[in-house]
Regions:
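Conserved acidic
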Residues: 1-252
């Protein structure tokens, strides 16, 4: 049981990992050995050769965007457009109650959702031995780089809050494939606030003005260290909860 929990989610993680590390059949190079996520987090690995390095040790060309990242980027941009149209149609329906906007919103939802499924299927295809461009190194590069990015942000957020509170504690309650859950109770206690509406507004402002810019900065630090093609990790505040209960892994 935890009071005042805030979650942060990475946006479309696997598609963005493919774009960030330039993961594609024609960009893959020979990899480095004896690489672990812990060694990468502590920056024990030499990454000065200029090639993009994924967390499993696989290396990629970074002088030109690969075929797969290019396709992913195109589909992602299209999904963003249709998702925006969906939200606009939903707002118009809420304002006018005109059924044509309801139908339009549903249409755009289906289009953007199909593109979301298509984007996420890229990882599954790469990891399928019957796929023409199957390569277990590519699939592993995606999953392990995802682990690296989550564990990296766990470490950096703990550093941030320990510095803020002058402590040596662990403020990450839990993490998932693309998200982290932070214990904000000490911050709420510091403010002395008791009104829940005011607390939520204050936490929202703090996350937007302090935490999200910090996350962007430390993800750029990791991207520079790994020589990525493009820094694509975007993490935004998702949930603000006055209480959170964890009964088991992935059960909360």
């Amino acid at each position: 049981f935890h009071e005042w929990v805030v979650s942060f989610d990475l946006n479309s993680l696997y598609p963005h990992l493919i774009m960030q590390y330039n993961i594609s059949p024609e960009t893959i190079l020979e990899g480095q050995k004896d690489i672990t996520i812990d060694k990468l987090i502590s920056k024990e690995i030499d990454t000065t050769d200029g090639h993009c390095l994924a967390a499993n040790g696989t290396m990629y060309k970074s002088d030109k965007q690969g075929m797969l990242p290019r396709i992913i980027q195109k589909e992602y941009n299209a999904r963003t457009i249709f998702k925006k149209k969906m939200l606009e149609a939903e707002q118009m329906y809420a304002n006018t109650k005109d059924k044509k906007y309801e139908k339009l919103a549903r249409k755009y939802y289906i289009v953007q959702h199909s593109k979301k499924i298509s984007l996420n299927s890229a990882y599954g295809a790469i990891g399928n031995k019957y796929f023409r461009y199957y390569d277990h190194r590519q699939a592993e590069a995606i999953t392990m780089s995802g682990q690296l990015n989550i564990k990296w942000i766990e470490k950096k957020l703990n550093e941030y809050f320990n510095k803020l509170y002058n402590t040596k504690d662990d403020y990450i309650i839990a993490s998932d494939t693309d998200s982290v859950y932070i214990n904000m109770a000490p911050l709420v206690k510091m403010t002395g606030a008791t009104d829940k509406v005011k607390i939520v507004k204050a936490l929202d402002k703090f996350c937007k003005e302090k935490v999200e810019p910090y996350i962007a900065t430390v993800y750029k630090e990791l991207a520079d260290y790994m020589n990525v093609y493009q820094q694509k990790m975007e993490m935004a505040r998702e949930v603000i909860a006055d209480r959170g209960i964890w009964t088991a892994k992935k059960r909360y």
